[in-house]
Amino acid sequence: MKLFYKIFVFLLVSNICFSQSSSNEATKLRQEGKLEEAIKAYKKEYYKSPKDSKNTYNLACAYALTSQKDSAYHYLNSALKDNTSLWALVDSDLYELTDDPRWAKIESAQLKKFQELNGAIRQVEYAKKLLNIILKDQALDYYIDQAKNFYMKQGYVPQWYYPLGSYKQKIGHENYSNMEKLIREYGWPKYAMVGELAADAPLLVINHHKSDSIRKMYLPIIKQNCFDKEGSCMEYAKIQDRILVNADELQIYGMQFRYNAIRELEPFPIKDPEYVDQRRKEIGLEPLKEYLKRKINYDWTVIQKNKS
């Protein structure tokens, strides 16, 4: 149970989701763990609208989640034909594809298209390695999320969860070690060096590390980059709040959640909650009411004030 709890907490603090939207029927089936049925639903939509790149992308993801690599690559290449973003390179749904030689072609193609549109990335090889770290940081989340849903419905941990949880922790240890090596070689990543998406890699790994001593060690540089607009203030807020919550102190940005007595998510207690939006605004975050409704469907009703 201890292992499940650790991964369970990890899922609460991990807020990245890179899957794109598609048909409600297919998405519902996917969320329920019915991947083969989801594939059929995505393909049905594909035959009706073959140029719908979002649906085609999700079809590729569903194939990847079921380790059907050839089909996954077929639809992924189609979906990304006119796509100039880097999101596919960090989508954990595609993790199963990354040990295939074809993945390098996907990486190169997306990085080329992205730079043609947005300008050259100063350290593109560093960016590529950081993007891979982000993808691995989220690896297996779909399957572990299925275990979480099972636990919430049935009240006990499914036996198939434990090897996944153990492997997830192993990936986390390897990712942190690789991150340290990259920082020693290239320096701390900033937006100007590797782009906004890649620069978030160390923050995600640090936030998901089991040790608060690691988070505390890196917090000053994470905070400074936030204020210098060279790093994510969202991830800084998550890390700062996680340190406080783990020390049984009040969080200050409202980024950490817990399950209450009726197994519904709510934010951990917040210091001076009537001023939380003012603190969030100072680092460019949306009002807490909007954030909580969007992330956990929680109604935040504390009336906000401003200190002069």
Positions of PLM-derived features:
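Canonical positions in the second alpha-helix
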Residues: E45, S78-A79
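Canonical tetratricopeptide repeat
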Residues: N58, D91-D93
